[in-house]
Structures are given as C-alpha cells and as structure tokens.
Amino acid sequence: MKVLIVNKFLHPNGGSETYIFEVGKQLQKMGHQVEYFGMEHEGRVVSNRLDCYTGNMDFHTGKLQKLLYPFRILYSTEAAKKIRKVLDDLQPDVVHVNNFNFQLTPSILYAIRKYEKQTGRTVRIVYTAHDSQLVCPNHLMQRPSGELCQECLGQKQWNCTKHKCIHNSRVKSLLGSVEAKIYQHNHAYRMFDTVIC
C-alpha cells in the first residue's frame, strides 16, 4: 500500500510529529511505501520522492506575514498545487492527514478529491485528530483563563470571538471563528473517510 502522511511540520516539533514519524516507521516495517508532505524546514527529517513541500510559514514574525495571515489561513494555493504533484507521483492509496490548519489549510483536501475525480483513482483520507480543531477554533476547548469551555460545540463557533479564545485577541478569535464557519459551510471536514481520535 502507498501512504502519504501529511502534517504541517516535518521536523521534530511536538507530539503530532513524534506520532507521524513513528506511524510512518511502523508502516514501512510492514512493507508499505510511505512518503510525507508538509512545509519545508531546515530541520525536516522525512521526505517525499520529489522533495516537494510548501514554504515555511511562521505567523509570529514579520509585518507582511501578519497582513496576509487572514487570507493564507483559509486556502493555500501553494499547498494545493504542491500536494497535487506529490499525488501524481506517488499515486497513494491512503492520505493520512494530521495537523494541517493555518499553514496547509483544507485546500489539500479539495486537491485530493479533485485528484480522485481527474484520475479515477480512489484515495482514502484518514485524519488523526491531535486536538479539538474540528469543533473548536482555538483547538483547545479552553478560554485564555484556562477555564474549560464547550460553547463552540453544536456549530456555535462565534463564541470563540465572544470570549477572545485565540491568544486573548478579538481579531485572531474572529479569524478563527470565520475560518471554522467557512469550513463548516463548505463541508471541508466531511471529506475525511475516517477520523482517529
């Protein structure tokens, strides 16, 4: 089986990266072909045959980045184009999606489904939920005070803005709420065939 593992970071950065490296290693031990797609980074430790990755995006630096932030978190044309190249080359049976929001965006999901339609191939999209992104714009189900919160459940993502849940910022929380509503409206997360929690 051919598996493409997608994660925004392809270098040691946290728990999801430890997870994808181990899953990939175990799949390879079982004889599966595994490649990776995400952002380029000088510390990248996994790859795909084409060495095709998106540019490294860090929203915490640079004034230009901050101006482009609202647009780049919603849809990445770069990610859509580059994952398509990797899909055409690898022709995966499964795409295992992990952390992708903000940098890679659901544009990759649309690109995978478009690839299926154009090639006639069936690709299963498996998503591992490393956080609460699908139901909570700030990923944590927690207010800035640390108080646990479930107010966004039931498609009520505007509560994120009301409580300034993302970095205690009304603007960032509004962007998170808008992002969640757009993906809800476009059924982006319904493109997953399987969700692992």
Task: Report the location of each language-model feature.
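Extreme N-terminal starter segment of soluble prokaryotic enzymes
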Residues: 1-3
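Membrane-proximal helix-turn-helix segments that form the acceptor-binding/catalytic region
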Residues: 114, 133, 142, 148-194
